[in-house]
Amino acid sequence: MIESSQPPFCQADVSGSASVDLFGQPIIKNELLKDRFGEVPFTILDSRSGNWKKRKQKWLKLNIKSEVGRKDFNNSTKANNFANMNNDKYDIGGYHKLNSESGYASIFNPALAELLYNWFLSEGDEILDPFCGGSVRGIVANYLGYKYTGIDIRAEQIESNREQALNILPVNNQPQYYVGDSLIVLDDFKKHYDCIFTCPPYVGLEVYSDLNGDISNMDYDYFINSYKQIIEKSIDKLKVGGWFIIVVGEVRGKDGYYLNFCGKTKDIIINAGCKLYNEMIYITPIGAKAMTANRLMKNKKIGKIHEFVYVFRKV
């Protein structure tokens, strides 16, 4: 249990300096943008930088293990076959980690969650995550002073998330987790949230269970239909003026062509009552991509080392 009255990841004081020179003019401090905002607030978010790696390691020292709870996820089956067919592997807002239970599981980067929360939210804001998956986004949110509610269809994943949160956060500052299909669970939610912050599974590339309602195991057309309905119901629970933040990446179909998943995602959110406010490119580490570049280029495919972060606002 972390016992600290002041979390090490609090937002920087950006109120400016009260110091003045001999002529009464304000003295401008030589302050780096990354020190003021955590990272430079530009449209490129580079997780390969030294500053980013340091921030991520600080979070991992809290013993966040988002891959735990995925022992039924087998990358050697449908997900891996799909990826191998396309000669590619993907991250979703994070990085891959090998563990004995789950094989390679994508882990949401805690430094990305920290950055986006602090850039767009105010202390105490309430967050809804209809595709919560692992523990990262919930633990980071509540550690920073926000209030997170996540939904996942897999009971073992939610059990793991709750256990990790109890080991890291005070008992009176716990993320709220719900087990079930978001299409159904959201119908019972009465409150409205300040932010929706989520990262959906890649269709065909990340299969977490064979449960009915788990969109990760659906064919593309069924996936898009359920995905659309969940997003629409989530936006119904978003306050007017609230933020919808989503991390997504493009995927290829069985014919090798991109499916325009990112474009469809934007259309769904806009048609549900939001407007696109910011768009960022999140660069992931090259890692194993360097070893697959030759194979990819045989099929004229460029190795993908980026995701998109879309920030919408409900109007």
Label every model-predicted segment.
Residues 1-315:
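Class I S-adenosyl-L-methionine-dependent methyltransferase catalytic core
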